[in-house]
């Protein structure tokens, strides 16, 4: 009877009993592999060969790139020739120039454009003046007023020529209505 209990254990070969796959967990097995790989690639473990820390670009180079971006802020995509010129001025590789612009368009450019909008000298007008100016610039034939431009409604009408008259009649009706006031007098 004792032989029957030992039977399955005796069917394994001595090599299978002692193999790392049978006696160790997968994490231990991986560490064995990495120990074996560390012996062959010992050079990679030396401090001199570690990945270099990311450094900032030289301040003078960044200033040149920022100046170029500010001048071209509405189309901040330098051509290959412009990248080459910037590369020579900044002593940076074309790849670093391209990467700087990719990041700067996300990080710096929105601030540049926002700053321009907030500048009281350069920025946009606010309030009624801005609305009137906008209307003047978009529709030269209509005098600027602080209400909706109804005349352009039928011009942009998706209806065919037959129904354009109906749109024009509707716009005339809207124009003839008195404006509603928000506060009673």
Swiss-Prot record:
<keyword id="KW-0371">Homeobox</keyword>
<dbReference type="GO" id="GO:1990837">
    <property type="term" value="F:sequence-specific double-stranded DNA binding"/>
</dbReference>
<dbReference type="InterPro" id="IPR009057">
    <property type="entry name" value="Homeodomain-like_sf"/>
</dbReference>
<dbReference type="GO" id="GO:0000122">
    <property type="term" value="P:negative regulation of transcription by RNA polymerase II"/>
</dbReference>
<dbReference type="InterPro" id="IPR001356">
    <property type="entry name" value="HD"/>
</dbReference>
<keyword id="KW-0539">Nucleus</keyword>
<dbReference type="InterPro" id="IPR008422">
    <property type="entry name" value="KN_HD"/>
</dbReference>
<feature type="region of interest" description="Disordered">
    <location>
        <begin position="1"/>
        <end position="58"/>
    </location>
</feature>
<dbReference type="GO" id="GO:0005634">
    <property type="term" value="C:nucleus"/>
</dbReference>
<keyword id="KW-0805">Transcription regulation</keyword>
<feature type="region of interest" description="Disordered">
    <location>
        <begin position="166"/>
        <end position="185"/>
    </location>
</feature>
<feature type="compositionally biased region" description="Polar residues">
    <location>
        <begin position="21"/>
        <end position="39"/>
    </location>
</feature>
<dbReference type="Pfam" id="PF05920">
    <property type="entry name" value="Homeobox_KN"/>
</dbReference>
<keyword id="KW-0238">DNA-binding</keyword>
<dbReference type="InterPro" id="IPR050224">
    <property type="entry name" value="TALE_homeobox"/>
</dbReference>
<dbReference type="GO" id="GO:0001227">
    <property type="term" value="F:DNA-binding transcription repressor activity, RNA polymerase II-specific"/>
</dbReference>
<dbReference type="GO" id="GO:0000981">
    <property type="term" value="F:DNA-binding transcription factor activity, RNA polymerase II-specific"/>
</dbReference>
<comment type="function">
    <text>May have a transcription role in testis. May act as a competitor/regulator of TGIF2LX.</text>
</comment>
<comment type="similarity">
    <text>Belongs to the TALE/TGIF homeobox family.</text>
</comment>
<feature type="DNA-binding region" description="Homeobox; TALE-type">
    <location>
        <begin position="48"/>
        <end position="111"/>
    </location>
</feature>
<protein>
    <recommendedName>
        <fullName>Homeobox protein TGIF2LY</fullName>
    </recommendedName>
</protein>
<keyword id="KW-0804">Transcription</keyword>
<dbReference type="GO" id="GO:0000785">
    <property type="term" value="C:chromatin"/>
</dbReference>
């Amino acid at each position: 009877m004792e032989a029957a209990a030992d039977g399955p254990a005796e069917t394994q070969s001595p090599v299978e009993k002692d193999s790392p796959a049978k006696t160790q967990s997968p994490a231990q097995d991986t560490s064995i592999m990495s120990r074996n790989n560390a012996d062959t690639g010992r050079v990679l473990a030396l401090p001199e060969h570690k990945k270099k820390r990311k450094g900032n670009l030289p301040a003078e180079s960044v200033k040149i790139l920022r100046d170029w971006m500010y001048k071209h802020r509405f189309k901040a995509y330098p051509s290959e020739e412009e990248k080459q010129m910037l590369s020579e001025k900044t002593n940076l590789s074309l790849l670093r120039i391209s990467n700087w612009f990719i990041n700067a368009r996300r990080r710096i450019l929105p601030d540049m454009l926002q700053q321009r909008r907030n500048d009281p000298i350069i920025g946009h007008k606010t309030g009624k003046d801005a609305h009137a100016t906008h209307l003047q610039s978009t529709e030269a034939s209509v005098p600027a007023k602080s209400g909706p431009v109804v005349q352009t409604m039928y011009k942009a009408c998706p209806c065919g020529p037959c129904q354009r008259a109906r749109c024009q009649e509707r716009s005339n009706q809207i124009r003839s209505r008195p404006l509603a006031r928000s506060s009673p007098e």
